[in-house]
Regions:
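Extended cationic-aromatic binding surfaces that line active-site or macromolecule-binding grooves
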Residues: 18, 67-70
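Hydrophobic alpha-helical positions that pack around
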Residues: 62, 66
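Active-site segment of metal-dependent pyrophosphate-handling enzymes
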Residues: 71-131
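N-terminal phosphate-binding loop and adjacent alpha-helix
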Residues: 51-61
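Nudix hydrolase/Nudix homology domain
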Residues: 39-43, 108, 112-198
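N-terminal strand-loop-strand
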Residues: 1-48, 74-78
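Short, catalytically relevant binding-site loops at active-site mouths
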Residues: 32, 52-53, 82-85
């Protein structure tokens, strides 16, 4: 039985980048690829995400991670509405902050070694400049997809090959297997769930 005394909380921020009709996501590096129950390779993808260090602001945490992962600067854009997502349920929430309002807060529960952990991911709309200037670092791959492709990927049904055939784009120095499925992390799934892509 997991007791409340053993609960842990971690705070993350993520940056949602959109240029014209496409969203930008990172495919995690090969060490984090996994196979599903049918032996098919799954490539986790999500927004640029960072754990917030003690004394750090959301914007500085995002700035640090964007420079590390894709070598670009980022600016938070205030969202008109904010959503709270937990267990697949989406609720609009009131945020008193005038600046740096997130598009959504995704609460994820994990149990590891009899310890319950809650991750809170604050996802912000951001401006990261032109996609032409973006280059993946740290063995990640950048994928660009429109909302229709994101809907399919959020359900775990989009392969790398189909992404290319249907107008998506991959920027990478590593080869992504054509038949591998793009698998959503909470930040990319949250973008789909909060209605931004409906």
């Amino acid at each position: 039985m997991v007791s409340s005394k053993e609960d842990e909380r971690s705070l993350f921020v993520s940056g949602i980048v959109k240029n014209k009709d496409k969203y930008l996501f990172l495919v995690k590096n090969p060490e984090q690829w996994q196979q599903d129950e049918n032996g098919r390779l799954r490539l986790p993808f999500g927004t640029v995400e960072s754990r917030v260090a003690k004394g750090e602001t959301a914007e500085s945490a995002l700035m640090r991670e964007f420079k590390k992962e894709i070598g670009t600067e980022v600016k938070i854009v205030n969202s008109e509405t904010s959503h709270f997502i937990y267990n697949g349920q989406v609720d609009e929430m009131n945020m008193n902050a005038r600046n740096n309002k997130p598009l959504f807060v995704y609460k994820e529960e994990k149990i590891e070694e009899d310890r319950r952990r809650f991750d809170y991911i604050y996802s912000f709309l951001t401006d990261a400049g032109k996609f032409d200037d973006i280059r993946p670092l740290n063995r990640n791959a950048v994928v660009l997809m429109n909302r229709d492709l994101l809907k399919k990927a959020a359900k775990g049904k989009l392969s790398v090959g189909e992404l290319k055939l249907r107008g998506g784009r991959i920027i990478s120095e590593i080869e992504l297997p054509e038949d591998a499925l793009l698998y959503p992390t909470p930040s990319s799934k949250g973008l789909y769930l909060c209605g931004r892509c409906h």
